[in-house]
Amino acid sequence: MPMQGAQGRLRGSLNATPPTTPHSGLAGNQTGPWCLEVSIPDELFLSLGLVSLVENMLVVAAIAKNRNLHSPMYYFICCLAVSDLLVSVSNVLETAVMLLLEAGVLAAWAGVVQQLDNAIDVFICGSMVSSLCFLGAIAVDRYITIFYALRYHSIVTLPRARWAIATIWAASVVCSTLFIAYYDCTAVLLCLVSFFLALVVLMAVLYMHMLARACLHARSIARLHKRWRPVHQGLGLKGAATLSILLGSFFLCWGPFFLHLTLIVLCPQHPTCSCVFKNFKLFLTLIICNSIVDPLIYAFRSQELRKTLKEVLLCSW
């Protein structure tokens, strides 16, 4: 039936798992009694998406309102908020359309839904790639701030920041289009996974180096005041906790999704991998949770931004 075809297509290239072959000896739904499938209610999924949408819209509004926040660092944070906003919107839109399909409301529009599916998939993939890129850009920006403080404004200029932002958005559109067009190509999946792993390594190295530099700086200051141990230990624990939250939330929210892509390449027919495939909606939910956490880590810790956010909220009332 056309409606069934459209609905299957709407599930998207992103969560498409390779079909089982007659030679595998494994039925499509046979994963063993030990397989745990976490069911995510549509209401919860939509609610998280709406929370992320509102939260990131507030970040964008606050940065747009306050001219003091019109700097490269906040431009990157604003673009991260836009990317996270698009992640939420696209996933919420896809879920809403699927619910309408299941209810039969869009049965007469199957052809339009198929075209909408392509646009939504590109939207989802592009926003994910751009979100990851801007997380990396923020890490690089903070690294330059600490290690090249005196030269920061000559290195990270507004024109260069705008070029970097434009390049990231353009690359995200190209990557998402290629991924949706060639989602069944092993090389494309491996490129995405490699990109994620490279970004994890980059962020870990940069932030750990920044933490080491901060501890060394605190040690130097504490020696001058002859109270090295308590100050150094306190800063080290606080920095380690911040680093753990930053990298931990990033890996926890994004790791399962890229594990899913990796297993599609490595073991598409294995029962254990098939069990992982069943939890794809959980992985998307974790990515939306990351869109909720990002403003808390990168935006709302700024006193200036929080002050502007209060003004935005008061004006809205």
Curated annotation (Swiss-Prot):
Chief localisation class: membrane
InterPro entries: GPCR_Rhodpsn, GPCR_Rhodpsn_7TM, Melcrt_ACTH_rcpt, MSH_rcpt
Alphabetized SMART domains for the sequence: 7TM_GPCR_Srsx (SM01381)
Native organism taxonomy: Eukaryota, Metazoa, Chordata, Craniata, Vertebrata
Topology within the bilayer: Multi-pass membrane protein
Record keywords: Cell membrane, Extinct organism protein, G-protein coupled receptor, Glycoprotein, Lipoprotein, Membrane, Palmitate, Receptor, Transducer, Transmembrane, Transmembrane helix
Transmembrane segments: 38-63, 73-93, 119-140, 164-183, 192-211, 241-266, 280-300
Species the sequence originates in: Mammuthus primigenius
Extracellular side, ranges: 1-37, 94-118, 184-191, 267-279
Record bears the keyword ATP-binding: no
Name of the protein in its database record: Melanocyte-stimulating hormone receptor
Family: Belongs to the G-protein coupled receptor 1 family.
Cytoplasmic domain ranges by topology: 64-72, 141-163, 212-240, 301-317
Subunit and partners: Interacts with MGRN1, but does not undergo MGRN1-mediated ubiquitination; this interaction competes with GNAS-binding and thus inhibits agonist-induced cAMP production. Interacts with OPN3; the interaction results in a decrease in MC1R-mediated cAMP signaling and ultimately a decrease in melanin production in melanocytes.
